[in-house]
Amino acid sequence: MKHEIKHDPAFRALTPKWHHGYRFQYEPAQKAHVVLYPEGMIKLNDSASLIGGLIDGERTIAAIIAELQREFPNIPELGMDVDDFMKVAKEKYWIDLV
């Protein structure tokens, strides 16, 4: 089933989890959070790091957005930013959406 990404309650009801073999962690040598995978590493920017840190296989996309909105209430496009991150992460096989 294909979901429309932006403002789609069905999409936001999905739960992201890191794809098998992929791991989110802080990498001191990079001074940044990264996604490690068998073939390499992806260095994340600050926004992606905040989102990635909330991916635990239990929170839905909507719950991640709600938590970030509590922390950053003055960012109206935050939900769309999270949607965009999830879309890219899914396309690049960093995460699975269940």
UniProtKB/Swiss-Prot annotation:
GO terms for molecular function: quinone binding. Disulfide bonds: none annotated. The keyword ATP-binding does not apply. The keyword Glycoprotein does not apply. Keywords: PQQ biosynthesis. Gene3D superfamilies: Coenzyme PQQ synthesis protein D (PqqD) (1.10.10.1150). Belongs to the PqqD family. This is PqqA binding protein. It comes from Pseudomonas syringae pv. tomato (strain ATCC BAA-871 / DC3000).
